[in-house]
Amino acid sequence: KRIQAEGMVLDIPTYSMYLDNIQPSINKQSILVPCYSSRAKCSMSIPVEANQQPFQYDRGGKIDSLRQYQFKIGARVEPQRPIDVSNTTLNTRAYASQEHLQEFSKALVATGLGNRSLLNHRENFVMGRSLSAMGGTEDLSEKALRVEIEYNSGHANTAKNVFTFVNHIRRLQITPSGLQIYG
């Protein structure tokens, strides 16, 4: 009788997508992610070119001359120091930014996807951040999520649309009185 009264509870991993833009020729900008989920796991932002032909649409993330980025959760910055990607954006492209690849790898693992290959990280650039450790979640219901980005001075960046995907868990409760969804 107790189970019949309480109903069935399911935790369903879902994604929400938020759109923001990067203005051209401005070095320091913020990407606002208006996600107020109570159980967020990770965030992945993909900057794509804003001016594209519909028949030649390219979904690959563009890095241009990005110098560094850092996630802000409320007043807390994650990670403590900005992630430097300038060695990836230099003309020599001598080596990849290991901090960036590590953060992106942690974001993929937090979603449950895992990573098989990060070989094309320059051609398909994604800024990722796991919001908690060990499979946990972060409560964003009272906080704002932002990505602070900074471009190299002297290099003009192009206008971009930033698609941010937030992986979070929604709770579905089915009772005799009806269905409730908690986010």
Residue map of PLM features:
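Flexible assembly/topogenesis modules
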Residues: 1-183
